[in-house]
């Protein structure tokens, strides 16, 4: 069974990691008052970054509640999100949503992100494998 923790290795920590997702996202999912940007990370686990600014969510209490709920939703869905770096960007109005509505919305957003995942090549389709020219 995969660990459902939210350790340091499951977070985007540096500006370089955030920039990689912002500069070339392979997945983009808009939602009600939120935008998800994602990029494949080549790891066996997903990583999450949150952008919840004062301009869009005024009260610190609301920002902290949103961070808690988003992290919790991510934690429960991380098995299906393996291999992604995901940045959640809050927009105006996200702080006014109630907890059940937020849980429901993020459940749908994670599923939409998975549907938008680019198809990976099968080993037989990869260059150099079928023709035996790989090193």
Swiss-Prot record:
The keyword Protein biosynthesis does not apply. Gene3D superfamilies: 3.30.230.10. Keywords: Endonuclease, Hydrolase, Nuclease, RNA-binding, tRNA processing. It holds the Pfam family Ribonuclease_P. GO terms for cellular component: ribonuclease P complex. It catalyses: Endonucleolytic cleavage of RNA, removing 5'-extranucleotides from tRNA precursor. Consists of a catalytic RNA component (M1 or rnpB) and a protein subunit. This is Ribonuclease P protein component. It comes from Pseudomonas aeruginosa (strain ATCC 15692 / DSM 22644 / CIP 104116 / JCM 14847 / LMG 12228 / 1C / PRS 101 / PAO1). The gene is rnpA.
